[in-house]
């Protein structure tokens, strides 16, 4: 079969391997048998552990990084969270996963794309700085493929122009900038354990 031929190659890289073991299967079965599959003590424990391990004030578990991006985007319109209004401009990288952009659009923001640095595929600071305008209210960063932009410069720019910063750290779990975990610089961040993300 073609599958056997692929595995006979000297180098075979499957799309994904199992990212769970026996303990995780037993834990999942325990939750299912007890009919406690959402918002149970295991969820709270996971959120607390995640926040503690990654230096965040708190964590909220959702089903995916895309859902987290959507939740963050809509939360930006809350006065006590971001205070952005429909039509406000958010700067975002031109290279990213579509749900990061569409979450902002669905929340009613005007997205202005920023070029990326070809060496890192992350937001170009020079283009970011050039595109800050009078309608700009936020910067949506993506830490692509475990890389991160110069957070010192980004945060200084944000302070200078009173911009909210949000981070998509789905592909950068465990990455740090000057010993600070990415995802802890801005107002909120998304993370993910999806098998193709860089951990």
Model-derived segments and their meaning:
Residues 119-199:
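Active-site phosphate-binding strand-loop segment of PLP-dependent enzymes
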Residues 1-37, 41:
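N-terminal "arm"/small-domain region of PLP-dependent enzymes with the aminotransferase-like
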Residues 95-101:
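Conserved coil-to-alpha-helix start sites within the AMP-binding
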Residues 23, 41, 99, 123, ...:
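Residues that form or flank phosphate/diphosphate-binding pockets in enzymes
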Residues 95, 109, 116-118, 144:
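Active-site loop/turn elements of alpha/beta-hydrolase fold enzymes
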Residues 40-89, 103-106, 113-115:
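Phosphate-binding glycine-rich loop
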